Amino acid sequence: MKTFLLVILLLFSVSLYSQKVTLLYVNSSWNKSNDYKHLSKLKNVRVLKVNYDDKPKKFKQQVKSVPAIILFDESNKLKRVWQGGLSMRLNVDPKEIQTMINKIIGQ
């Protein structure tokens, strides 16, 4: 799990100072029809969108299914992962994601 976090940090070289929570959204170009449409509804979170196809093998070994949503706190600690199932759809209520974001930031 530490390797996964390190790979993500190195891949994106993102400064995470403006938000306490970062959401990494991973999907593939061949799965655009199943894009998760609710990201814009989420508050108090920095959203990074990543194309699975463009990432190295090590990244792909860590993300087993797309689409996927991965939440990190301000210390870059992995907090929660949601992944698409056999349907290649992400069936998670945005309220569930927002609840986890609020929990991380202490609201």
Predicted ranges, named:
Residues 52-59:
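N-terminal post-signal-peptidase region of extra-cytosolic proteins
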Residues 73-107:
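Non-catalytic, surface beta->alpha helical segment in thiol-disulfide oxidoreductase systems
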Residues 22-25, 68-70, 81:
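Soluble periplasmic/extracytoplasmic beta-strand elements of cell-envelope proteins
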Residues 4-14:
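Sec-dependent N-terminal signal peptides
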Residues 61-72:
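Structural micro-motif
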Residues 32, 62, 90-94:
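Solvent-exposed, acidic/flexible segments
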Residues 18-47:
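Local sequence-structure signature of Cys/Sec-based thiol-disulfide redox active-site neighborhoods
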